[in-house]
């Protein structure tokens, strides 16, 4: 009788657990289905139908290092239709704005970010970063891109890579690839699912690495590679034709083998120059690491962490940031020395006329969207680039890399009106771009009040629940990917 009673209790407990499990699965699957329909209710609206005339502005030419002074800018349906020498155009139907002598540059591109929240795109826009390239694509990013293209809300343009293709032993948030055949399959699936480029890590074996590049050429999709060096066993020539190479830190960790070798660095720079492939240094993320290592909690206290997605904040706290907070003084000093050498690597690459791009790695280690882009630009300047060279890296170089320079990347008639207006000349100090008094997004005028509203809304990010649902969607999608 006693055994029968125990058996009955076990059976009842199991039934309850089964019911709760089924309910949880139903809730998760239903929530995933609803992701296509659920959006925050405080996203700013797109409103760019009016013709815009901006008088009394100075146009910065990113191709020639010149300024066209005292111009009038005419924008219609999001396109620059005229740049007049005087205030010629006038219309009762147009919105006329006095530019008050502002300097106008193209909107900035951040070519290496990690997006974990729609609000990151709003925060980027508030800082004049009108386009970003997200290098760890998920289904949610394709969803956000479609929403932006449909004009459902106001945010930066987004270019979305595939999920990161990585070798055996990678963590669950990457797509593991263990054979050349699987590499080819992942490329085809990424292309058919709407991703715009392939992102692959550098420690893939040479045969997988070469298979991915070969298949990408066949289906006409670009490839960005982690680390400006070939995979082990592959030739430098295998890197030709890639869209970009990421992280100068990997020059130090890869071909330099952790040696502060200036002579060998110059030889490597010659090899990189011969590739004709742009480099994205991502200095800001290493500087952030260095500050975490040296100043620890006192540095964290200076950051406005309310801008970070709550789930992403927890993941970064436990799996990334925590490792640098336990560094001893010797390790901290090493990071300072290494950071200075990374600046030297960028200088040598620039001296060898390697095309450089601005990419902050924003989203890693508490780096904040938007402001991280400007920090990256300042670090490029510290590396020896002129203000003009930094501006080129953040605008026309990026547009050329993405093959969209016929529509973006300069202030020119016929191009999309994604622009920044600042009160002081950015060719005198690139830091002036950090505080725009206005941004124009696809022809929509965003004054200081609107930019402030974007920043304010960006703090009200996605809930923990919906962030988890997005994560589960990604894991399930890639399990079937």
Identify the residue ranges that each predicted region occupies.
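Structural recognition of alpha->loop->beta junctions
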Residues: 194, 233-257, 376-390
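Histidine-rich, glycine-flanked metal-binding segment
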Residues: 34-51, 59, 63-105
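Active-site neighborhoods of metal-dependent hydrolases
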Residues: 195-197, 256-383, 475-481
